[in-house]
Regions:
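Cys/His-rich short segments
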Residues: 118-171, 175
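Phosphate-backbone binding interfaces of nucleic-acid-interacting proteins
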Residues: 536-658
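Helix-rich, typically C-terminal accessory recognition domains appended to large enzymatic cores
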Residues: 123, 346-383, 394-502, 615
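Structured secondary-structure scaffolds
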Residues: 2-51, 103-107, 151, 157-372, ...
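Short secondary-structure capping/junction motifs at helix and strand boundaries
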Residues: 89-98, 116-129, 141-142, 156-159, ...
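A glycine-rich helix N-cap at a beta->alpha junction
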Residues: 78-94
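N-terminal catalytic cores of NTP/NDP-binding nucleotidyl/phosphoryl-transfer enzymes
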Residues: 2-78, 97-112, 117, 134, ...
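Intrinsic disorder at enzyme termini
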Residues: 476-557
Length: 658
């Protein structure tokens, strides 16, 4: 038996749906999981941290068609965008799984066949209501005013042949398991919701295949069916670590399953605490030890959504505040159970009060005084006073409290405790007044001891901070010229090496910000985007048309517009424009230059060779200082995404659209 082996710990996030760029509310989950994973590593666990993307479904098939690309091309682009955001936020995942990965698709097919062969899946017909954005089926009794109970969007009637999973068969066993394992669903309020709203009233069998679209994993023995999202997406947690239902699973699966923690949003907890454990029971696999449904990060008027126009993106916030400031904010402001709120005002407030003042100023003052009074040398002269014990007690108690909080997944409370070290250290400076001690040569040893205690307290605080703000932690420790302390060694105060020398020039960790300046930049950013939109729409719409309420026109008016098919032969970005692409479009025997506000959805190199619908008799106009000789037609979905209007069949450029 291996006596020195680390205990495995498997943590996963929900895999992100590849319908668009993730906003800061989505990003919160990966940052939260990263903080937990990093802390578990500090505790000595052998951590495996998995995240990824959910890439199949009708919604993606429709979005890809609107964009004029294949579903695989569409999800490749979005998955890359999601991974870039996860990497920008400095998250330490070990695996980024995509449900279009070949090994995942093969295992899903084998799992489907196994469950069918053992009688847990059967063929039938579905008739009811369906929400495409949520990919959820509903009965008429569950729907109010024709709207999806989850997202509030309209549902549509659906009727199709489908395979179903016998949920009802396993419901009693799951109820028994939840009652015997109260830690399985957290927080407790989520457990009560699942029991009272779904399990106790009785489960209906679950649709696990579709025939009304093609973008999915085919059912091997009935290929007109594709595997529905839940049997596909949920199984990533086992396929990603090498599960094989034929009994040939990788050593990684044997080592890490069952998962220690599935970290998910509260809106998908039903699928992870009812459907997923029942699938696992049917496969004869142990259930994950805990599923935690975290709250939402809201922006003032509710849940973020593109349709509401209240979306904030991580990369935008990072441009303003930096990676660790954004990490601190989302981790600090999100309670254990209730939703948190994000706003520019609150972020600036935290930046100034917590990061620049409490933390940054403390480090700067300590390093500066050490250089000023002792040439940067830190030395404990043993000139102790009772106030020192209060500082030491706060630090050592905090180490224990942080450990307790993190074991209970109370991450916001843990980071608050860490900042109590920095608050107490600032108070210690006020209590000991090093600048006064420096005036008295007889108190030089006392001054040295005070600065040693401050350096030691900051070292322990910065070491604790690593799981939450890794870059800041490393910067602080570099200024103190010391290594990150292990959790075990944090339980002892006074391990900072005597005679060590801090950096000569302290680095400003966080600069104070003026809310007026920030809001001016934010408003300028919004205004620039709005102006560009307005300029583009001005050209795209008939002059004099009332955009808010378009007047009726006669057929003769419509007949004045000429629509033709054009082939894009060259395309490039417009300098200094965030939204415009400049395309050279061949229309019959002539080539025209046309500007379009589609940069966010299409790369220039992807435009070349496309055939598009063009309004060819518009009066030329200047956009961003460049001449545009027509308009390329696009469609806009309810989330503001644009898709080129392309002919269903290949036709010659110059062909008239009628």
């Amino acid at each position: 038996m291996c006596t020195n082996c680390k205990k495995p710990y498997y943590i996963s996030t929900a895999i992100a749906y590849t319908s668009g760029k993730p906003h800061i509310g989505n990003t919160y989950e990966i940052v939260l999981a990263d903080a937990i994973a990093r802390y578990k590593r500090e505790q000595g666990y052998d951590v495996y941290f998995q995240t990824g993307t959910d890439e199949h479904g009708q919604k993606i098939e429709l979005k890809a068609a609107d964009a004029g690309v294949t579903p695989k091309e569409f999800v490749d682009g979005v998955a890359g965008q999601i991974k870039e955001i996860w990497d920008l936020m400095n998250t330490s995942y070990d695996k980024f799984i995509r449900t279009t990965d070949d090994y995942h698709e093969k295992q899903v097919q084998k799992i489907f066949k196994k469950l069918y062969d053992q009688g847990d899946i059967y063929k039938g017909h579905y008739e009811g209501l369906y929400c495409t954005p949520c990919e959820s089926f509903w009965t008429p009794s569950q729907v109010v005013d024709g709207k999806c109970p989850d997202c509030g969007r309209p549902v549509q009637p659906a009727k199709e042949e489908a395979y179903f999973f016998r949920m009802s068969k396993y419901a009693p066993k799951l109820i028994e398991y939840i009652n015997e394992h109260p830690e399985f669903i957290q927080p407790v309020s989520r457990k009560n919701e699942m029991m009272n709203n779904f399990l106790l009233p009785g489960l209906q069998d679950l649709c696990v295949s579709r025939t009304s679209f093609k973008w999915g994993i085919p059912v091997t023995f009935d290929p007109k069916h594709v595997t529905y999202v839940w049997l596909d997406a949920l199984t990533n947690y086992i396929t990603g670590i090498g599960y094989d239902c034929d009994g040939n699973s990788d050593e990684k699966f044997k080592k890490y399953w069952p998962a220690d923690l599935h970290l998910i949003g509260k809106d998908i907890i039903r699928f992870h605490t009812i459907y997923w454990p029942i699938f696992l029971m049917a496969l004869g696999l142990p259930l994950p030890k805990q599923v935690f449904g975290h709250p939402w990060l809201l922006q003032g008027d509710g849940k973020m959504s593109k349709s509401k126009g209240n979306v904030l993106y991580a990369d935008t916030l990072v441009d303003f505040f930096g990676v660790d400031a954004v990490r601190y904010f989302v981790l600090h402001e999100m309670p254990f159970e209730n939703d948190g709120v994000i706003s520019w005002d609150l972020m600036v407030e935290r930046m100034n009060s917590d990061l620049a003042n409490i933390l940054g100023n403390l480090v700067n003052r300590t390093v500066s005084m050490t250089n000023k009074y002792f040439g940067g040398i830190v030395e404990n002269k043993g000139a102790a006073e009772p106030v020192d014990e209060e500082l030491k007690a706060t630090v050592l108690e905090t180490v224990k409290k942080v450990d307790e909080k993190m074991n209970k997944l109370r991450v916001a409370d843990a980071i608050t405790e860490i900042f109590n070290i920095f608050r107490r250290s600032n108070k210690y400076i006020d209590e000991t007044t090093p600048w006064t001690l420096a005036k008295d040569e007889a108190k030089k040893d006392r001054l040295a001891t005070v600065l040693y205690n401050l350096t030691e307290a900051i070292t322990i605080g910065a070491s604790l901070l690593f799981s939450f703000m890794p870059q800041t932690s490393e910067k602080i420790l570099a200024q103190l010229n010391t290594e990150k302390r292990s959790l075990e060694n944090m339980n002892t105060f006074g391990l900072y090496p005597n005679g060590n020398k801090v950096t000569e020039k302290p680095e400003i960790l966080f600069a104070r910000m003026d809310i007026k300046d920030v809001m001016e930049k934010v408003e300028a950013m919004k205004a620039a985007a709005a102006a560009e939109n307005k300029e583009e729409k001005k050209e795209e719409e008939k002059p004099g048309m009332d955009v808010e309420k378009k007047p009726e026109i006669t057929y003769d008016d419509f007949a004045k517009l000429q629509f033709q098919i054009g082939e894009i032969v060259k395309c490039e970005e417009v300098p200094k424009s965030k939204k415009l692409l400049c395309s050279q479009v061949k229309i019959g025997s002539e080539t025209r230059q046309i500007l379009s506000g589609i940069k966010a959805w299409y790369k220039p190199e992807d435009m070349v060779g496309r055939k598009v619908m063009v309004v060819t008799n518009l009066k030329p106009a200047k956009l961003a200082g460049m001449l545009s000789e027509g308009m390329i037609l696009c469609a806009e979905d309810d989330e503001g995404n644009l898709a080129l209007m392309t002919p269903a069949k290949d036709v010659k450029s110059g062909s008239e659209v009628c």
